[in-house]
Design a protein with these regions (language model features):
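Surface-exposed extracellular loop regions of Gram-negative outer-membrane beta-barrel proteins
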Residues: 365, 455, 475-532, 551-571, ...
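Periplasm-facing N-terminal accessory domains of Gram-negative outer-membrane beta-barrel systems
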Residues: 19-109
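Periplasmic N-terminal accessory/gating domains of Gram-negative outer-membrane beta-barrel systems
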Residues: 80, 87-90, 109, 113-175, ...
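A beta-strand signature from Gram-negative outer-membrane beta-barrel systems
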Residues: 96-98, 153-154, 198-239, 250-252, ...
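C-terminal beta-signal and adjacent terminal beta-strands/loops
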Residues: 646-679, 692-700, 704-756
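Transmembrane beta-barrel wall of Gram-negative outer-membrane proteins
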Residues: 247-278, 289-325, 329-357, 391-398
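Outer membrane beta-barrel strand-and-loop segments of large Gram-negative receptors
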Residues: 382-386, 425, 429-433, 522, ...
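Gram-negative outer-membrane beta-barrel transporters
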Residues: 439, 551-556, 574-652
Length: 756
């Protein structure tokens, strides 16, 4: 059935392609100095009133062009315009590699028109695009810009703490968010010191964050997608950087193995990066006022090799190794992740279709030794293979593909009642998808369909999706999305835990799962499922001020959780819950040549039902506000000032009713309960998560000075203050020791980065 479905997709899209008899221009726009792609450049065909914008990889296509002679004009702010004469014949598909030279000042209206064209022609519901420039502009801990810190200023995104915090997106837990790096699934993208991720900012090309309502090309998760794409190495010269701050040191090296030559688009290039934490070695000298120190240690290595053969064809080989460790007095936690793979892009001649493929594998292992609990360990490893096609017509765009996923999970855990839970499972999934984009006057529609087959469970899940946008006026647009989603991966995070360094992974259970509150009525399937509803408006108030308003509702129709209260071995290891998340996200962006301001506000509710009661999970935050501003000072903009303020209402927690002595009887009936001390057990309130922690607020400031010594040699010195007001934000309350544990206090820092 799966192969018949995919064959139908190919035949359908091939038929659409054969109907197109006019000419097509496609190509890539690059920076002439580094040969790096230029995203969102404006490409116009003078004489035909046709045009396009480049995507994140610098690619563009203009279809259904009448035959004749034209001038192709390419422009981008800060670059000289390029004008190319073009002659087109019937059925011709012409490829152009276009190189822009820095130094010109394209009109700001050109950039604005490029933005508006993209906004009017792309649905972009609940999609936020993040660039390295935006990440670097944010005041960051230690002066080290990182996507982990930038994600938290996006509407609908919440991080639960500076240390070991988890990322929650519009009511979805971390395991419901799929994090991708060049097509690879990254199971733990954030280090235990929550300021930093495994992704190197200088290596990022583009990050797409889908907070809900994503279309059919993404599957396997029920809440959100974070898609990180890295760039290729410099194709013309050897370059790099070194950086040092109180938190970490890092380096990057890149260059050509086969240099790009004039008149050719063929090259082989590489890029490699590494970073290592040093905060655990210097915290005693620099931050000795922090209770318990900052005992975090991590190391990240990533490398990429790119072969480009001309006409837009390329092959990437990549690999990574990430490690992390925490050494608290009562808790030792560590994890390691490694993987690699390849991806390719083919642009067949005289065809309106792009072929993309990816094959990756990855492995993740974690372990925790906690004085208050038994040791726990978890591992997940697997592979992913995908073949995707993009076919272009005049007002049509088809995306379709086939994917194969396989992974193994291993988890070992002993609950507080002494019952051991141990699971090792192998899982395989096949997915096929189709997304069709059609522009009809002011209306843009994107219906999609995904077929997800879970082989290990023998379950097929049909996932229709729909996105649309209606251009009410040039400055006002309505957009909406709807879709069904499923996944087979679940985690062991307990909703009672505000802080949990350890996250175990499991696949969907083979055993039967009962409906909430029932011991006889079984669920229809063993998948986690959800339905998304999103609607909102985009408003261009002025040329430089854009407002986005979105309301959303996520219906988590089935959530599978670990049964932590299991009493007997014959009881089920898993339970079913249901849930919902709903709210409104508002964001405004004001951009000038020297100044940028960003405001994001989220109002949200998250609820879960376990068969007995409806309760808010620990990441239910009612109000969340972020204010970000940057300003460039000086005749040559050599100074960059930044500020970020975050306010969030308190998270819920379950109140404590009392304590008791817990005897595990680990020696059986002969256990001595008279002279041996039992463990201290906690009696929780029957009403789950009815308490609320105090509100959170933090102000971060930064000042950066740029020094340029030559064309390629420059240095950035950044002074930053994290939690500048030294506010005592609560992290969690230690019930056993009856003491408050705060998040990190004021942390001033100075960092230096040298680029060559």
């Amino acid at each position: 059935m799966m192969m018949r479905f995919f064959t139908l997709l190919v035949l359908l899209c091939s038929t659409v392609q054969l109907q197109a008899q006019k000419a097509t221009i496609r190509g890539n726009v690059f920076d002439k100095e580094s040969a790096q792609p230029i995203a969102y450049a404006t490409v116009q065909l003078d004489g035909a009133a046709l045009g396009a914008s480049t995507d994140a990889s610098g690619f563009f296509t203009i279809n259904s062009i009448p035959l004749g002679d034209y001038t192709l004009k390419v422009s981008y702010l800060g670059y000289d315009n390029v004008m190319l004469p073009i002659s087109l014949r019937d059925g011709e598909v012409e490829y152009q590699a276009i190189y822009l030279e820095q130094g010109g000042e394209a009109l700001e209206e050109v950039v604005i028109s490029g933005y508006k064209e993209k906004a009017q022609n792309d649905v972009q519901v609940s999609k936020l695009t993040v660039t390295p420039k935006q990440i670097r502009a944010l005041p960051s801990a230690g002066g080290d810009a990182d996507i982990a810190q930038y994600l938290t200023v996006l509407p609908g995104v919440i991080l639960t703490g500076d240390q070991g915090g988890q990322l929650y997106i519009r009511g979805g837990s971390p395991v419901q968010n799929r994090i991708l790096l060049d097509g690879m699934t990254i199971y733990n993208p954030f280090h235990s010191l929550g300021f930093f991720s495994v992704f190197e900012t200088e290596l990022i090309r583009n990050v797409d964050v889908f907070t809900g309502g994503f279309n059919a090309e993404y599957g396997g998760r029920t809440s959100a997608i974070v898609d990180v794409q890295t760039r290729e190495g410099n194709r013309k010269r050897v370059a790099g950087l070194v950086s040092a701050s109180p938190f970490q040191i890092k380096g990057l090296i890149e260059g050509p193995l086969v240099k790009l030559k004039e008149g050719s688009d063929k090259s082989i290039s590489f890029v490699a990066t590494a970073k290592k934490a040093i905060i655990n070695q210097v915290d005693d000298q620099l931050y000795n006022y922090v209770d318990g120190g900052i005992p975090f240690n991590y190391q990240d290595i990533y490398g990429k090799l790119t072969l480009q053969s001309g006409n837009g064809n390329k092959l990437n080989l990549f690999g990574f190794n990430y490690t992390d460790g925490v050494d608290f007095p009562a808790t030792q936690f560590s994890w390691g992740s490694s993987g690699g793979g390849l991806d390719f892009q083919l642009l067949p001649q005289n065809s309106n279709t792009i072929v993309k493929g990816v094959f990756t594998f990855s492995d993740y292992d974690s372990e925790i030794n906690d004085a208050d609990n038994k040791p726990r360990s978890s591992g997940i490893n697997g592979y992913f293979a995908g073949l995707n096609f993009i076919s272009f017509g005049k007002d049509n765009e088809f995306r379709y593909g086939l994917e194969l996923t396989g992974f193994q999970t291993a988890f070992e855990f002993e609950n507080f009642r002494g019952v051991n839970i141990n699971q090792t499972e192998n899982t395989s999934e096949i997915g096929a998808f189709l997304r069709w984009k059609r522009k009809i006057g002011p209306l843009v529609i994107e219906p999609g369909f995904r077929l997800q087959y879970y082989l290990s469970l023998s379950d097929v899940y049909y996932e229709p999706r729909l996105g649309l946008k209606y251009n009410i006026t040039d400055n006002l647009r309505f957009k909406a999305a709807w879709g069904l989603y499923s996944q087979n991966l679940l985690s062991t995070i307990n909703d009672r835990d505000v802080v949990n360094l350890f996250v175990g992974f499991l696949s969907g259970p083979d055993e039967s799962i009962f409906e909430p509150g029932s011991t006889t009525e079984k669920t229809e399937n063993r998948l986690q499922t959800a339905i998304h509803y999103v609607g909102g408006f985009e408003i261009d108030l002025f040329k430089t001020l854009n407002l986005n308003i979105e309301g959303y509702y996520k219906d988590f129709t089935q959530l599978i959780s670990l049964n932590r209260d299991k009493l007997e071995p014959e009881e089920s290891d898993f339970i079913k819950e249901t849930g919902e998340a709903y709210g409104v996200d508002v964001s405004a962006k004001y951009e000038l040549r020297r100044a940028n301001f960003w405001v994001a506000y989220s109002l949200g509710w998250v609820k879960r039902f376990d068969g007995e009661q409806t309760y808010p999970p620990v990441f239910d935050r009612r109000h969340n506000l972020n204010l970000v501003g940057t300003y460039e000072v000086g005749a040559k903009r050599q100074w960059e000032l930044g500020a970020r303020f975050n306010f969030g209402t308190g998270f819920p927690f379950t109140l404590t009713q009392g304590f008791y002595t817990n005897y595990t009887f680990d020696q059986g009936i002969g256990s001595d309960v008279l002279t041996n001390n039992g463990d201290l057990g906690i009696v929780y309130s029957d009403d789950r998560n009815t308490g609320r922690l105090p509100a959170y607020s933090r102000l971060d400031l930064s000042a950066k000075r740029h020094f340029r010594f030559s064309k390629h040699l420059r240095m950035d010195v950044t002074a930053a203050v994290t939690n500048a007001l030294d506010r005592e934000n609560i992290f969690y309350f230690d019930r056993v020791r009856y003491e408050r544990v705060n998040q990190l206090p004021i942390l001033p820092s100075l960092s230096v980065q040298l680029q060559f």
